[in-house]
């Protein structure tokens, strides 16, 4: 038994209202109410996938990974303890806030709070109604999407996420950060999604560079691009990645953490072999981050 998918993410932000507007009106998420877990947002039949809480860090506050059942949770708890990781069993109050049957909490080697859970709440009786025009998000067995973890030591992080949590390497991109600076980015999967997690020693102040949501059609991407571009928040133009072949754009959230919004990523199957790339994109993905940063400051 192992981790099945990325199930949810929680952000601590200084402007909850701005995030609410961005997630719903720009990206098409559905408001799911305000609870002790924060402002909740849906993208499918799950009760929530993203939580936004008041806080000053303007960053990812926690992430939750899903396992199939109680036995899977116990197995992951044992594996973490054997690796010397401090593990806490979530109490009834935390389980209620998260809307799960059971969970454990711990942290990765560089302090990101993580959770593993089973028995998430489904709300099929409440159809998903997007906050803006989008035909749907790709979730199911592939989970919520992915995020890119920024760490000071990628080897240490890679060992933790693969040896302890059980992620598998999909591929590596050597990211050229300057004339004489190359940073390898490692892309990891735990299901058919090409990567649920990426790890890189990017010199950034945030815990993550971006999180990704995958939508059902190219038109979904295009319409969202126009909505986000109207506010000057695009950080990277439309492009197609070399590794997962996703067509996407990047935009700045109100906290400065970026979001990738994409379509048509290829999946990993049993025939997959690890490869490496010298460039992150076949075409496009031209940076316009300076413009977005100026707009956020304004």
Curated annotation (Swiss-Prot):
Any GO BP: xenobiotic catabolic process
Coiled-coil residues: none
UniProt cross-references to SUPFAM superfamilies, sorted A to Z: Glyoxalase/Bleomycin resistance protein/Dihydroxybiphenyl dioxygenase
Reaction it catalyzes: biphenyl-2,3-diol + O2 = 2-hydroxy-6-oxo-6-phenylhexa-2,4-dienoate + H(+)
Record-listed Fe cation binding positions: 146, 210, 260
EC number, as in UniProt: 1.13.11.39
Cofactor binding note of this UniProt entry: Binds 1 Fe(2+) ion per subunit.
Tree of life domain: Bacteria
Cofactor: Fe(2+)
Residue span, VOC domain: 5-119, 143-264
Broad enzyme group: oxidoreductase
Activity's dependence on pH: Optimum pH is 8.0.
PROSITE patterns tied to this protein: EXTRADIOL_DIOXYGENAS, VOC
NCBIfam families cross-referenced by the UniProt entry: 23dbph12diox
Family the UniProt entry places it in: Belongs to the extradiol ring-cleavage dioxygenase family.
Protein name, entry field: Biphenyl-2,3-diol 1,2-dioxygenase
Phylogenetic placement of the source organism: Bacteria, Pseudomonadati, Pseudomonadota, Betaproteobacteria, Burkholderiales
Gene from which this protein is expressed: bphC
């Amino acid at each position: 038994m192992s981790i099945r998918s990325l199930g949810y993410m929680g952000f601590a932000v200084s402007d909850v209202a701005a995030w609410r507007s961005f997630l719903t009106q720009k990206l098409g998420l559905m408001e799911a109410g305000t609870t002790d877990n924060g402002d909740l947002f849906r993208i499918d039949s799950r009760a929530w996938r993203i939580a936004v809480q008041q806080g000053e860090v303007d960053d990812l506050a926690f992430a939750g990974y899903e396992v199939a059942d109680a036995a899977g949770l116990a197995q992951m708890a044992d594996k973490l303890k054997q690796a010397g990781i401090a593990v806490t069993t979530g109490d009834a109050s935390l389980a209620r806030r998260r809307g799960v049957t059971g969970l454990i909490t711990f942290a990765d080697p560089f302090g990101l709070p993580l959770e593993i859970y089973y028995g998430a709440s489904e709300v099929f009786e409440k159809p998903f109604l997007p906050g803006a025009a989008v035909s749907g998000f790709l979730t199911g067995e592939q989970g919520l999407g992915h995020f890119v973890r920024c760490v000071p030591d990628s080897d240490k992080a890679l060992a933790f996420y693969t040896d302890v949590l059980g992620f598998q390497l999909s591929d590596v991109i050597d990211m050229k950060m300057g004339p004489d600076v190359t940073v390898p980015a490692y892309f990891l999967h735990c299901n058919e999604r090409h990567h649920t997690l990426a790890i890189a020693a990017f010199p950034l102040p945030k815990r993550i560079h971006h999180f990704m949501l995958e939508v059902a059609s190219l038109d979904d991407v295009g319409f969202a691009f126009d909505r986000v571009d109207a506010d000057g928040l695009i950080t990277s133009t439309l492009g197609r990645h070399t590794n997962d072949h996703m067509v996407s754009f990047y935009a700045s959230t109100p906290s400065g953490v970026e979001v990738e919004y994409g379509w048509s990523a290829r999946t990993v199957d049993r025939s997959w072999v690890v490869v490496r790339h010298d460039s992150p994109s076949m075409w496009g993905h031209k940076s316009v981050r300076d413009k977005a940063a100026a707009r956020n400051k304004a």
